Amino acid sequence: MSQLDIKIRKLQDNGSTFRANIETLYLGGVRSAKVDRLHFEVPEEWKVCTISLHVQRLSGTLPDPQILDENNSVLVDRRWTLEKEGTWMLLAINDSGYIAMTKPGKYTCYDTIDTDTTTENITPSIYEPVSYTHLTLP
């Protein structure tokens, strides 16, 4: 499993903007799962927050968010890879009402061959002559 280390930095150009040091994540093949782990280095003020990772696929679908673990990491699963690309962001919330999010980044997956439909449909008319041949006694 590979790990992508992503640093979230706070910019103060016009108010506070949180941004990832990697703008586009390249996450393996379409429909892959649990191949990559994302590890986030978060700003100091986020260390007391619950941090969730939100994905929006290219089609507009918004899968359930993932909560970062105690190491600020998540496994990339099919929430990300069911479609070739989309956007992502982190959301940090604490009990005192603090809410912050990163500027959305992009992710992309490379095209793969559709393995869900590669099995050939064999109709009875194709295999019947073969099975009868083997059942014939001399």
Name every feature range the model reports, one short phrase each.
Residues 118-130:
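Charged heptad-repeat coiled-coil "rod" segments that mediate homo-/hetero-oligomerization
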Residues 133-138:
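Conserved small/polar residues in nucleotide/adenosyl-binding loops
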Residues 1-116:
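N-terminal assembly/attachment segments of tailed bacteriophage virion structural proteins
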